[in-house]
């Protein structure tokens, strides 16, 4: 039996994610490389950098729930629309079972597992098919999940309703590009970018992301 090594003296936000419909990808090696590259880009804010564990699943830990939510959004946008990811976030203590694989255990990990299983089940229903992120906290302390999950469900619905151009605009704005720069890239006017960002909810998603990032 593996010896459990405790890495943190205080609760953390565990992030678990996996690829939706991964078996349908014809080139699994390419899929693995793209996900691994996306994970490397969200490692800086992590307590334990997210990495692939078993199959197309990955896990990591962040100091706050907000940082984990923000990392999940960055991952989703960096892989969309070709690769769809679902997430579970859990708050609580965690322990690493194995340093080589990065596999974790403990209340925080169990909460994240519960969250991603709920996400997978919920997206099977027509009214909630665009849900991709959920949060659980069974510690009795820290951020409570109800308001966070309400915000995540609404944000995910907006995000899942975007077409490819709107996704590119959202991704560019989050990366710090101006609407004028994005207009040149897209071959449309800056006014058209602004109108699209307003009409499709891109501006609202950006505001929500700023608020959610600050969740403790």
Predicted segments with their positions:
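Regulatory and interdomain segments flanking nucleotide-handling catalytic cores
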Residues: 1-216
